[in-house]
């Protein structure tokens, strides 16, 4: 499980701290919605913050995402192939969604937004399974994902 807790910032910059990673993330302005041309959007280190910044930017289409102060905590092992990046993206999406008072996106659209954040900001051309499972899973149930279309 990955969780993000925080509040709207009193400043114009986002401040982000991870309980699990010692590499600090310097304060940063709310990222703008990305340009339409394909390719990886340049993003300042640390690497783990690129996933967060990507989700924020893609949710900032209307320019209404506020700056925030937040803490991230996770029990998902990093770099072990168990979807830690998807967990971080989805936690970010739900955190920003709460800051905005609820965004009208379907669960499928939310998963695709998180996947695009990973493609465009982290430069990782991942599939969609991890994001879909992170958003749509129900305890005690299997989930069929048909990507044949």
Go through each PLM region and give its residues.
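Acidic/histidine-rich catalytic neighborhood
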Residues: 148
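Glycine-rich active-site loop/lid that clamps phosphate-bearing ligands
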Residues: 145
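ATP-binding N-lobe of GHMP and related small-molecule kinases
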Residues: 1-86, 90-107, 112-122, 126-129, ...
